[in-house]
Regions:
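Surface-exposed extracellular loop regions of Gram-negative outer-membrane beta-barrel proteins
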Residues: 46-47, 259-261, 315-317, 335, ...
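Transmembrane beta-barrel wall of Gram-negative outer-membrane proteins
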Residues: 157-264, 286-291, 299-300, 492
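Repeated loop/turn-to-beta-strand initiation elements of outer-membrane beta-barrel proteins
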Residues: 246-249, 302-305, 369-372, 453-456, ...
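Signature of Gram-negative outer-membrane beta-barrel scaffolds
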Residues: 345, 349, 356, 365-500, ...
């Protein structure tokens, strides 16, 4: 209901309206000042992996509202869930047929003010984003000496480096959903299917990327314009069948594809004072297939039994990333930049991950409201990453460059065949890794009412976890890093109901933060020359978190839309994992280290009220204090005292909604939504390099939906009205 009222189109837009939650760059979730690694996402209660190796969480905007029944966000830990979260557990429940047959279709059209009907640049591309570009696999698999001969006989690349200009047209999208019930054998068979497609065009003009040391010295800087084309596809199928009166079994299939193609035009100066101009093209294709089966069975009035299992296959492909760099001469002319062979290149990267989950749990009821829960869970995750680079050796090649956009008159296959350009295929053991994780878990939990208005929930979870990464050093030596742990995770949750309107909650728990695969793997990744590099740390260890919450809430009995809550929380972080920033070769290098301890504490306030008929307002805000104590031998850190990486000191959400109903049941829903995220540290500086910070960000959105009848409605959505420079 809230998603409909506020015009929310996907899960990410809904989650970021919740108290204490914000979305950082690249869709990373920040909860109570804790970054992506401190939260977890499940689909219908089962873990779901992220296809993006940079993030632990699956991008939440991959789930369109048309496929979602509800979103449950829990910021306190319960023993029935995996223990690897201290921020939030976000469970996305996909739609099920509620017994009412329906079919609906929706279409949308839109665009961004600074993009629509403006010039839009893109590098040469063979297929649309519905298909994956690629390279003949035999050019990846063959021996190096064979490749050097084969490339002179056949061009393995289907694209060139030309940049084309067009006019940005409106964005189009659509969704379709339907459901139907049948009576089979005296039971109900339900089928639901939904899908959505959307595309987005976005431009960023006159942006600046600069690397500074703590003393203020500029190592390099680049101005750039960015042109991004993005496609999102999602599909859901759900088949359910009832057994007996209260039993049921079901199967759910979810598919999502997020594909983006970004062209960057960059100008600037590197660390060695070369004045440069660059064309970069980056394509990311993330796909997810998730299969789930589940069953629910009741045995008498006291016992019930749940079983479920899932298989997820995620793929992350970065096909044919291209970079072409020019150096500006004093007379303004251009020549190919040839500092080393890495300035002009192509890159192909593929990540494949498979995850299996099995879950069994049972509940025994005694008394009027008391319960005992028992359960066991198994999870196995396997990842494989491979990458190949093709460097263009341009030494001795001096073409006449008159147009930096159209380059196929000299960057062509003919010049490869005649020897003016030499292609070097680079495949090294250090540019690939394998990783895996296995968890065996069991839990017990009791919900007991010593008196009618006081709930005591006490749980204990045991997890045996093994996480490993196989990688290679720069010298090609095979290495294996393993984290093997046996842990107990207690959880205490108390609720005292003062009366029908007021209640108080208290929670305490211990949880774990495990490093992600990419954080553990010493694999160097860089999207563009002079841009930030990412390099994992094989020495990372698990971090542990001690969490405490105290919450008061009031819901008016005669109108639950009117509510007020205030929450105080504190977290002690033992060995928290921090994203650090160093420099190498003039470029920033982001890596990861365990700090000694950290603290996160804050106050959250939420207020919702129906001011008068059909007119509602809501405000929620958070004030957060975070601090990291660095190891005594951690002298590499530039600043000895600072807040947690990714934490904003304050967050505010506010909304006003007007929803009158007119004659013939026509209805208007109009909402104005405001959000501010305070400044935050993106990456921690070490070895004299300063912390990388993001300033406060303000956004204002307007959404209007007009329901003409039960079968037809119109929606207008305007986002980021403030258009703040970032």
């Amino acid at each position: 209901k809230e998603m409909t009222l506020k015009g929310i189109s996907n899960v990410q837009e809904g989650v970021k309206k919740i108290t204490g939650i914000s979305i950082a760059s690249a869709g990373q979730l920040i909860v109570r000042g804790l970054g992506d690694r401190y939260s977890t996402t499940t689909l219908n209660g089962l873990p779901i992996a992220s296809p993006n190796p940079d993030n632990k969480l699956i991008p939440l905007d991959i789930f369109p509202a048309a496929t979602v029944q509800n979103i449950t966000v829990s910021k306190v830990y319960e023993a029935g869930a995996f223990a690897d979260y201290s921020g939030a557990h976000i469970d996305i429940s996909t739609k099920e047929n509620t017994g009412v047959d329906f079919f609906n279709v929706g279409f949308n059209v839109g665009g961004q003010f600074n993009t629509l009907f403006q010039d839009f640049y893109s590098m040469d591309r063979v297929h649309s984003l519905f298909r994956n570009p690629g390279i003949d696999q035999k050019f990846i698999d063959m021996e190096r000496t064979e490749f050097e001969s084969a490339i002179l006989q056949k061009n393995p690349f289907k694209t060139n480096f030309d940049v084309k200009k067009k006019t940005a047209l409106p964005e189009f999208g659509g969704s379709m959903a339907g459901a139907k019930d049948w009576q089979v054998g005296g039971q109900t068979l339900s089928l639901l299917a939904a899908m959505s497609v959307s595309n987005d065009l976005a431009t960023i003009q006159n942006a600046l990327y600069r690397t500074l040391e703590a003393g203020g010295h500029t190592l390099d800087y680049f101005n750039y314009d960015s042109y991004k084309n993005e496609l999102k596809i999602a599909g859901l199928g759900n088949l359910a069948y009832t057994l007996r009166q209260n039993d049921r079994i079901g199967y759910t299939f979810f598919y999502a594809r997020n594909a983006s193609d970004t062209y960057l035009r960059r100008e600037g100066i590197d660390e060695e004072d070369h004045e440069l101009l660059g064309n970069n093209n980056i394509t990311h294709i993330y796909t997810l297939q998730n299969h789930q089966i589940n069953g629910y069975h009741e045995f008498g009035s006291q016992w019930d039994f749940n079983w479920s299992g899932s298989y997820s296959k995620t793929q992350s492909s970065e096909p044919d990333r291209r970079q072409l760099m020019f150096e500006k001469n004093r007379d303004g002319s251009l020549e190919l930049f040839k500092l080393n062979r890495q300035e002009t290149m192509r890159y192909f990267g593929d990540l494949n991950e498979d995850e299996w989950v099995g879950d069994l749990r049972s509940t025994y009821r005694f008394g009027s409201k008391n319960k005992v829960k028992l359960g066991a869970t198994y999870k196995d995750k396997q990842r494989e990453f491979r990458s190949t680079r093709f460097y263009y050796n341009l030494q001795g090649f001096y073409p006449d460059i008159t147009d930096s956009y159209i380059t196929s008159n000299f960057m062509n296959y003919g010049n490869i065949q005649n020897g003016d350009i030499r292609i070097i295929r680079d495949q090294q053991p250090k540019d690939q890794y394998d990783a895996g994780q296995t968890i065996y878990a069991g839990f017990t939990e009791i919900e007991y009412y010593p008196v009618n208005n006081f709930l005591v929930s006490l749980g204990l979870r045991y997890e045996h976890s093994k996480q490993w990464v196989n990688y290679a050093t720069y010298g090609g030596q095979a290495q294996r890093n393993v984290l093997n742990n046996n842990d107990l995770f207690p959880a205490l949750n108390l609720k005292y109901t003062v009366n029908d309107e007021n209640s108080v909650r208290f929670s305490f728990s211990r949880t774990v933060t495990r490093p992600s695969f990419i954080e553990m793997a010493p694999f160097l990744y860089q999207e563009s020359y002079g841009g930030a590099q990412i390099f994992g740390n094989a020495e990372l260890e698990n971090g542990y978190n001690y969490n405490i919450d105290l919450r008061y809430e009031r819901f008016e009995a005669d109108n639950p839309n009117n509510m007020f809550s205030i929450t105080g929380y504190g977290k002690i972080l033992d060995s928290p994992i921090e994203r650090t920033q160093d420099t190498s070769g003039g470029a920033a290098v982001h890596s990861f280290q365990n700090a000694k301890t950290g603290i996160a504490a804050g106050i959250e306030i939420e207020f919702r009220r129906e001011l008068f008929r059909n007119f509602r307002m809501g405000v929620n805000g958070s004030y957060m204090y975070t601090n990291v104590k660095l190891p005594e031998d951690g002298g590499a850190y530039t600043n000895s005292q600072r807040s947690l990486q990714g934490a904003s000191p304050y967050l505010i959400n506010a909304d006003i909604s007007y929803s009158p109903t007119f004659k013939n049941q026509t209805q208007l829903i109009a909402s104005l939504l405001y959000n501010v995220q305070g400044p935050r540290i993106h990456a921690v500086g070490i070895n004299g390099l300063g912390d990388e910070k993001q300033d406060a960000v303000h956004t204002l959105d307007f959404v209007a939906n007009y329901k003409i009848n039960d079968n037809f409605s119109l929606k207008l959505q305007v986002t980021d009205l403030l258009n703040q420079d970032i």
